[in-house]
Amino acid sequence: MDISYHEKISKTYELIKKSTYSVAFTGAGISTESGIPDFRSPNGLWQRFRIVTYQEFIIDRKARNEFWKMKRELIQEIINAKPNNAHNALAELEKRGLLKYVITQNIDGLHQMAGNKSVIELHGNQRGYICLDCEKVYPLEEVLKMLKEQELDLRCEVCGGIIKPTIVFFGEPMPEKELLMAQQIANKCDIMFVIGTSLQVEPAASIPRIAYQNGAKLIFINKVQTEWDWIAEIIFYDSAGKVLKDILDVIKSEKF
């Protein structure tokens, strides 16, 4: 028999009280409440745009045009987005010493904006851009200017090389340092909140499994089911902002 929502909140609070090393693993679903679309939902990015792989981006000008067209449409949504209740709750948990790390697949920077200091970005971020030839770094502001003034194939002003955002494309290796750190944290944690992710993108999706295999209690917060729900100790099929705020409210009321 399923336990009630309030019983789940209470059980989560009891787990947090006993925890010495809790972490959060987040995906696109945590940021939808901030107005940033996710990938796989009926209104997600892959319903609106084709996936451009890393190999396509490198060799195919038409694919780069498609990517930058998508980026030009979406970048303002990301820039205008503000942290929501879920981001703010995770930042408050860290501030109280109840959360060691946030491991995120997101590129929006909202965890840092909310106040989290210990954030591992598995898929990079949208703040930086780099020439693939001479490695000149371009800030976001300069890229925005280029997108307004140039055709949709951004080139380095120094050497003419292809400019690429510092995000991880499909088919591109994940940054080794960040992946190794995430794996080490997953090995050590005793609680992992798994929030807003379908757990379909490898190797990032392996992180919660590593935590589970090493004895951690997993708390899933998703609006939909995933194929890995069976490894969770507690599952909330609800808004991340609502659930995390309610958990935080209990912590505050208990003065923990």
Swiss-Prot record:
Q: What class of enzyme is it?
A: transferase
Q: Which domain of life is it from?
A: Bacteria
Protein's UniProt keywords contain Transport: no
Q: Indicate which residues the UniProt annotation says bind Zn(2+).
A: C131, C134, C156, C159
What are the GO MF terms of this UniProt record? Answer: histone deacetylase activity, NAD-dependent; NAD+ binding; zinc ion binding
Catalysed reaction(s) here are: N(6)-acetyl-L-lysyl-[protein] + NAD(+) + H2O = 2''-O-acetyl-ADP-D-ribose + nicotinamide + L-lysyl-[protein]
Task: Report the subcellular localization.
Answer: Cytoplasm
In which residues is nicotinamide bound?
A: F39, I107, D108
Task: Give a short account of what the protein does.
Answer: NAD-dependent protein deacetylase which modulates the activities of several enzymes which are inactive in their acetylated form.
Q: What is this protein called?
A: NAD-dependent protein deacetylase
Source organism: Thermodesulfovibrio yellowstonii (strain ATCC 51303 / DSM 11347 / YP87)
From the UniProt record, report the name of the gene that encodes this protein.
Answer: cobB
